[in-house]
Amino acid sequence: MGKIYNSITELVGHTPIVEFKRLEEKLGLKGRIAGKLEYFNPAGSHKDRMALEIIEAAEKRGEISPDKTTLVEFTSGNTGVAMAAFAAAKGYKFKIGLQNGVSIERLKLLQAYQADIAEVPQELIAGVFEKGIAAFADVIEYMEKGVEHPFSTRQLDNPDNINAHYKHTGPEIWEDTDGKSTL
């Protein structure tokens, strides 16, 4: 019957690389341009890698466990979808704060993953745009209120985000190009 996987977490990475020959020709390039098709990841983007790495690294450090931890993140993008997907796959509760204007399709997808969708006051969101990344602390603090054992995944300043690409994406590119990748 072929290979059957135990979880979507086993399907992250090893996405195909495709050479964009028509683009090379159109631009008259002598070099090769290739792209890694990250939409082949189970939640549909390159954010799958870092979302899974953040969760699994925190598990290895003993910081979180599905039986008691609620993962918390403020995002309206692909990170939220990936976090929701892997939280569901691993048995975690996941609370996501969203900005206004998120598409109905994205809301339905997050709901399908059992995400707890939190409304964040506009004044807190405005602070992020005015003060930058430091203001995310206020948003996360607001979202963590009333949550027992919250763990903020902090995609923007979590070193496990970057580590996902050092540990997985980079080596995959190197392997898939037989060590002939250049920047």
Spans of model-derived segments:
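PLP-dependent amino-acid enzyme catalytic core
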Residues: 1-183
